[in-house]
Amino acid sequence: MTRVKRGYVARKRHNRILKLTAGSKRAHSRLVRPAQQQAMKTLAYSHRDRNRRKRDFRHLWIARINATVRQYDVSYSQAISLIQKSKMLLNRKMLAQIAVLDNSSFNSILTAAIYST
């Protein structure tokens, strides 16, 4: 049986792994075995943090809405309940943007929600 040389295939695989970990420090960007471990960990972190980002932004939107709503002596839960009962199709992201960028519009939305119920 003839000998199969895999130098080209192995080098190609190694270069692909090293390219993934190009920004890492020390051996994680130079040696294949630590680089492979680092690449696996990096991909796991990025997968986890894609879902975490959604959660974090929702927390941020809620905090912004809560801070703005408290100025009008209404709690966050009361404000969300009033907005939903008044059949306004505004989600938390929209409300947070309005609260940050245009406070008077947010005030009119809140008063409309209060008086419509």
Curated annotation (Swiss-Prot):
Main location: plastid
Role noted for this protein: Binds directly to 23S ribosomal RNA and is necessary for the in vitro assembly process of the 50S ribosomal subunit. It is not involved in the protein synthesizing functions of that subunit.
GO biological process: ribosomal large subunit assembly; translation
GO molecular function, one term: rRNA binding
GO cellular component, one term: ribosome
Keyword RNA-binding: yes
Official protein name in the record: Large ribosomal subunit protein bL20c
HAMAP family assigned: Ribosomal_bL20
Subcellular location: Plastid, Chloroplast
Gene responsible for this protein: rpl20
SUPFAM superfamilies: Ribosomal protein L20 (SSF74731)
Family matches, as InterPro entries: Ribosomal_bL20, RIBOSOMAL_L20_CS, Ribosomal_protein_bL20_C
Species: Zygnema circumcarinatum
Stored PROSITE patterns: RIBOSOMAL_L20
Entry keywords, A to Z: Chloroplast, Plastid, Ribonucleoprotein, Ribosomal protein, RNA-binding, rRNA-binding
Keyword Endoplasmic reticulum in record: no
Similarity comment: Belongs to the bacterial ribosomal protein bL20 family.
